[in-house]
Design a protein with these regions (language model features):
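Glycine-rich, compositionally biased intrinsically disordered regions
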Residues: 68-117
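Generic structural hydrophobic/aromatic packing signal, biased to beta-strands
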Residues: 71, 102-106, 139, 148-150, ...
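Short, internal acidic amphipathic alpha-helical interface segments
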Residues: 130, 155-217
Length: 271
């Protein structure tokens, strides 16, 4: 999040891991780099706790950042987005001394954040300084998964409350229609096991979700995940995958615009 990245090790890691990254091939200017096996393996314990794998994680983080920046460029006529990334090195005060997930996220740009600060006042606006307290579009890696999502962190109560207030003012059907355009995604409430599958949602199922969702207490996410276990990882290493991630994140932009506080979605303090 908004923390210094710290020391970057020059180590190359454990050469015994199968599928070590080959020498990079020359790619067209502006092309997104495909993922490599080390992007995932450097996040698996015990490597996730080792600074010897900082270089691998830094390379993976930069690939994710390029995906998020491509999304921001593509979406700039619809919404202005600012890109941030997670840290890639084990740093106990931030990640408990292990890096098991890397992400890049696109969230409201400085001008939009300034408007929100004016709306909520200086005291509450202090919470906006950490980017994750704003809703965001996310590209993420774990040892066994690749993910794109729209997420409102449990501490991002401004946007969570705005979302809930909008559904109360307009009813759930507009959101239902947006979610059911997102075949392949699922709606997620914190770490609950409920199945809210986009493309198959009914108004009753969405009512069930919002019966339990509490801004400030629960994570809200609309996410799509691809398995990346070593035995089946070849699919996520294909050169077209980063562009696919940009495409899938672009599909989330309408839900982002619906939920996030803005001039066009101003429900935060509605009665």
């Amino acid at each position: 999040m908004d923390h210094p990245d710290g020391r970057v090790s020059g180590g190359t890691g454990d050469d015994s891991t199968p599928g070590a990254a080959p020498a990079p091939r020359k790619r067209p200017s502006g092309a997104l780099e495909p993922f490599v096996p080390w992007d995932f393996e450097a996040l698996r314990p015990p490597r996730s706790r080792s600074a010897d794998h900082n270089d691998h994680r830094l390379a993976a983080r930069r690939r994710l950042e390029a995906v998020a920046k491509a999304l921001a460029t593509r979406s700039k006529k619809e919404v202005k987005l600012e890109v941030r990334t997670s840290i890639h090195n084990p740093f106990p005060p931030v990640n408990g001394g292990r890096v098991e997930r890397l992400w890049a996220y696109a969230t409201r740009a400085k001008a939009a954040k300034t408007k929100l600060r004016r709306t909520i006042g200086a005291d509450l606006a202090k919470d906006l300084d950490q980017a994750y307290r704003n809703g965001y579009l996310c590209a993420a890696l774990e040892a066994d998964a690749l993910e794109v999502s729209f997420r409102i962190h449990q501490d991002g109560w401004f946007d969570g409350r705005n979302l809930v207030k909008r559904t109360q003012a307009e009813g759930l059907r507009p959101l239902l229609e947006l979610l059911n355009e997102l075949e392949g995604f699922r709606l997620q409430l914190a770490d609950w096991k409920g199945e809210w599958i986009c493309g198959e949602l009914s108004i009753e199922r969405l009512e069930e979700f919002f019966k339990y969702y509490e801004p400030g207490e629960h994570l809200f996410a609309v996410q799509r995940r691809w398995p990346a276990q070593e035995a089946i990882r070849e699919a996520v290493l294909a050169p077209e995958v980063p562009d696919l991630m940009v495409d899938e994140m672009s599909r989330l932009v309408p839900v982002y615009r619906y939920a996030m506080w803005s001039d066009e979605s101003d429900f935060l303090f509605s009665s």
